[in-house]
Amino acid sequence: MIYLHAIDPIAFSLGPVKVHWYGLMYLASFGAAWCLGRQRIQAGRLLGVNMDGFSDLLFYAMMGVVLGGRVGYMLFYAFHDFLQEPLLLFRVWEGGMSFHGGLIGVLLAVAWWSRRHRLQMFDVLDFGAPLVPVGLGFGRLGNFIGGELWGKLTHNGWGVIFPRAPLSDVPAGQLAMQDVMNFVQIQEHYAAGLLGHYARHPSQLYEAFLEGLVMFIVLWLFSRKPRPRYAVSGLFALLYGVFRFLVEFVRMPDNGVYVAFGWLTRGQILSLPLIVIGLFLFWLSCRSPVLQPVPAPEVAK
């Protein structure tokens, strides 16, 4: 059954402050990461680090996600707008975060933290990789609730009508449904069955399922047994790269523009290196010893 998206992106208001569901998804992501990370610390999955050390690591990773995600969005998807108005970087309430930018931010944060604590960077990445899909899943749910990053038009029975989406898949300059009808009119047309040809793939939910649920289950189960260095990180990079590349085929390209060949998106280009890196890390893991878990110390490094 085709569904009309009518979810208010604002969860609640505190006086003049409006709290968006997307922001709550970030809080849920970090809360889940802390709980799951606690289990892995107690199981000795990060040599020489206790909960105090992990809390420190999570804080810097959070900073990497937020700062890297915002800067990455400006560089990868809105560079022209950023050059015209650099202060856009700080207007985070208008939306705009990039996974690939957030990943770079986390890598920089982990590299700094690992050096500071005299740990091997990939041991830290292997420890943290199973925690990331939960955040990805919550983030994509936030995208869906906010009615953004929609998919292409579809005739499938599970399509979703997004009032903010363009009326066609023709790149750039298209009016959105809410630009030509108010929401009451949209509801009336929907009830009369007149909007079915505007239904779109709920690509946010596809990504929440693949990048969130599926990746979490696979990585969590894979990492429960001792693995060689690089193996868990390699599996994360490979799975994310493949899943993101595939979902991009049913997701509208950023700014409605394909980068090449009339079908290749910027998201696919940014995901290809992850696939290559994942395979390379797997190759390295085959040449590395299996790391045995060590109980967490009472005092962190």
Swiss-Prot record:
Top-tier EC class: transferase
Keyword tRNA processing: no
Binding site for a 1,2-diacyl-sn-glycero-3-phospho-(1'-sn-glycerol): R140
Location(s) in or outside the cell: Cell inner membrane
Organism of this sequence: Xylella fastidiosa (strain 9a5c)
InterPro entries xrefs: Lgt
NCBIfam families, alphabetized: lgt (TIGR00544)
Family to which the UniProt record says this protein belongs: Belongs to the Lgt family.
EC number: 2.5.1.145
Gene Ontology biological process terms, A to Z: lipoprotein biosynthetic process
Gene Ontology cellular component annotations, sorted alphabetically: plasma membrane
UniProt pathway: Protein modification; lipoprotein biosynthesis (diacylglyceryl transfer)
Single GO MF annotation: phosphatidylglycerol-prolipoprotein diacylglyceryl transferase activity
Membrane protein topology class: Multi-pass membrane protein
Name of protein: Phosphatidylglycerol--prolipoprotein diacylglyceryl transferase
Function: Catalyzes the transfer of the diacylglyceryl group from phosphatidylglycerol to the sulfhydryl group of the N-terminal cysteine of a prolipoprotein, the first step in the formation of mature lipoproteins.
Main location group: membrane
Transmembrane parts of this sequence: 10-30, 57-77, 92-112, 119-139, 202-222, 230-250, 264-284
One Pfam family here: LGT
Keywords, alphabetical: Cell inner membrane, Cell membrane, Membrane, Transferase, Transmembrane, Transmembrane helix
